[in-house]
């Protein structure tokens, strides 16, 4: 497989693909194609087919050279990874041998000022991973103070969320907040940080990004979709980058890897048979060398599991946190 251009090294890529254990003739799904790092490693590990999904059309366009160099073994699909099962069915692969997911924003997106993800690069306050739906500027312009506070607290775990929300409401009365620098400067007036600590706007930007892209809902649905498409013995590998994501993955795999017993009085409460066997009792983390080469790897956690022959469980109900549709509807 030959290809020009710099090679992207995915976080915990070797470890994630090692968990998948690709084999000749297998079909694998990269739910978050990005720069194609995991896909390349899977294609190089064995004579496999890969279906790669990304909601960012720029990532899909940038992957064209890789498609050309892999002689029909790679299919790129512009879609959300929550639609993974439908994508596989459309590609004639109703069951697959492995699924890998790298959750959150990509380094390419963060490094592009015009995507509006970074408080360090001034650009339009966008933050969308795809090309549709409300932007972060729309949310900041229309959400109520209470909704903003909840969003920033729940998705950013920012203890000063009410102060930040109040400052945003006050600032937008004077002028629209449409750039990343404008928002970062507003947050910095109420959230202080000492030298060596994270930037004051870190948690607020994380919260808005997660909210705008409905990332946690997407993750819930993608995990459930992977459960449905993986064949017995198929493997799931998920790399997450903060506690909210990791908690969802850990809980999902934990719930689906144990059998809860009912009582003789309520035998109907017996849970479904385990649909996964957990392969990582503790998450795999990056070593010192990888962290030195890529500081983003410091917070990464990799969890893996193998599909059993049991039927997929009923999809979980989504938590009752604020939704993009409800907040935007209330703010109009």
UniProtKB/Swiss-Prot annotation:
Q: Which UniProt keywords apply?
A: Cytoplasm, Methyltransferase, rRNA processing, S-adenosyl-L-methionine, Transferase
- The residues listed in the UniProt record as binding S-adenosyl-L-methionine, with positions renumbered to this chain, are 36-38, 54, 81, 102, 109
Query: Is S-adenosyl-L-methionine found in the keyword set?
Result: yes
Q: State any single GO MF term.
A: rRNA (cytosine-N4-)-methyltransferase activity
* Gene Ontology cellular-component terms listed: cytoplasm
Q: Where in the cell is it found?
A: Cytoplasm
E.C. number, please? Answer: 2.1.1.199
Disulphide bond pairs: none
Catalytic activity reads:
cytidine(1402) in 16S rRNA + S-adenosyl-L-methionine = N(4)-methylcytidine(1402) in 16S rRNA + S-adenosyl-L-homocysteine + H(+)
Q: What's the superkingdom here?
A: Bacteria
- Which Pfam families does the entry mention? Methyltransf_5 (PF01795)
Q: Name one GO biological process term.
A: rRNA base methylation
Gene3D superfamilies documented for this protein: Putative methyltransferase TM0872, insert domain, Vaccinia Virus protein VP39
Residue span of region Disordered: 296-322
Which InterPro entries does UniProt cross-reference here?
RsmH (IPR002903), SAM-dep_MeTrfase_MraW_recog (IPR023397), SAM-dependent_MTases_sf (IPR029063)
**The family this protein is said to belong to:** Belongs to the methyltransferase superfamily. RsmH family.
Q: Which NCBIfam families match?
A: 16S rRNA (cytosine(1402)-N(4))-methyltransferase RsmH
Write down the PANTHER family for this protein, in alphabetical order. Answer: 12S RRNA N4-METHYLCYTIDINE METHYLTRANSFERASE, S-ADENOSYL-METHYLTRANSFERASE MRAW
As for what it does, the entry says: Specifically methylates the N4 position of cytidine in position 1402 (C1402) of 16S rRNA.
Name by which UniProt lists this protein: Ribosomal RNA small subunit methyltransferase H
Record organism:
Rhodopseudomonas palustris (strain BisB5)
Gene behind this protein? rsmH
């Amino acid at each position: 497989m030959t290809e020009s251009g710099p090679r992207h090294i995915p976080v915990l890529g070797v470890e994630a693909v090692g968990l998948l254990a690709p084999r000749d003739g297998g079909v694998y799904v990269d739910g978050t194609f990005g720069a194609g790092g995991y896909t390349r490693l899977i294609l190089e590990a064995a004579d496999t087919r890969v279906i790669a999904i990304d909601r960012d059309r720029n990532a899909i366009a940038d992957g064209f050279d890789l498609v050309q160099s892999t002689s029909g073994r790679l299919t790129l699909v512009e879609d959300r990874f929550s639609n993974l099962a439908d994508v596989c069915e459309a590609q004639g692969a109703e069951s697959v041998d492995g699924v890998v997911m790298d959750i959150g924003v990509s380094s390419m997106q963060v490094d592009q000022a015009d995507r509006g993800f970074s408080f360090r690069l001034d650009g339009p306050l966008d933050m969308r991973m795809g090309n549709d739906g409300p932007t972060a500027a729309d949310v900041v312009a229309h959400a109520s103070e209470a909704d903003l506070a909840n969003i920033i607290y729940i998705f950013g775990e920012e203890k000063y969320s009410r102060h930040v929300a109040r400052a945003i409401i006050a600032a937008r009365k004077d002028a629209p907040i449409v750039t990343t620098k404008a928002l970062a400067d507003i947050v910095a007036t109420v959230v202080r940080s000492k030298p060596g600590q994270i930037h004051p706007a870190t948690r607020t930007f994380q919260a808005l990004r997660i909210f705008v892209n409905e990332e946690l809902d997407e993750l819930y649905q993608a995990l459930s979709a992977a459960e449905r498409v993986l064949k017995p013995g198929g493997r799931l590998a998920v790399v997450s980058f903060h506690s909210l994501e990791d908690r969802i993955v850990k809980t999902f795999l934990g719930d689906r890897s144990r059998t809860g017993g009912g009582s003789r009085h309520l035998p109907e409460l017996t849970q479904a048979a385990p649909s996964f066997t957990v392969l990582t009792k503790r998450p795999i983390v990056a070593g010192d060398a990888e962290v030195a080469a890529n500081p983003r790897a410091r917070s990464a956690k990799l969890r893996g599991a193998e599909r059993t022959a049991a039927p997929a469980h009923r999809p979980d109900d989504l938590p009752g946190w604020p939704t993009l549709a409800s907040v935007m509807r209330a703010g109009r």
